[in-house]
Amino acid sequence: MRRAYLNTMKLVLPAISKNERMARTQVCAMVATLNPTVTELGDIRCALSEAVTNAIVHGYGSPTDVDGKLLYIAVTLYEDRSLKISVRDHGRGIPDIAAAREPLFTTDDTGDRSGMGFSVMEAFCDRVEVMSRVGEGTKVTLYKTLT
């Protein structure tokens, strides 16, 4: 049985660091129409921030080089107060998704990244799905049901 949705939105943004804020603002404004608690909205904001940052930094490798690199974000709100947020890039892809989802796993040798992105997303969402193909990109989908 298919769930009835209340609203849906798609965003396409250049994959640059300042658009992480834009994504959070737009998505949270839409989610706010479901009247979530402050904690629930904070959870969504934090998980989305991690997903977008991962796409920019790891998917494309540069938080400042725009050159045709785009983020695709889709949000669906359902009548049962659940939501789905997908963040997709056409970047490098993840060679080993299971390893990438382990706490503290990082491919960053500069020490700038903690390897906690997926752990944070999983802590704040009911479910996180990751689909990726090396050389083609990654799609991270966040699921949450509000109280």
Across the structure, where does each feature detected by a protein language model lie?
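Conserved short strand/loop->alpha-helix "switch" segment adjacent to the catalytic nucleotide/phosphoryl-transfer site
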Residues: 24-50
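A generic structural signal for short
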Residues: 15-16, 40, 106
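Conserved beta-strand-loop-beta-strand hairpin that lines the nucleotide-binding pocket
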Residues: 1-10, 55-147
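STAS-typified acidic loop motif
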Residues: 10-22
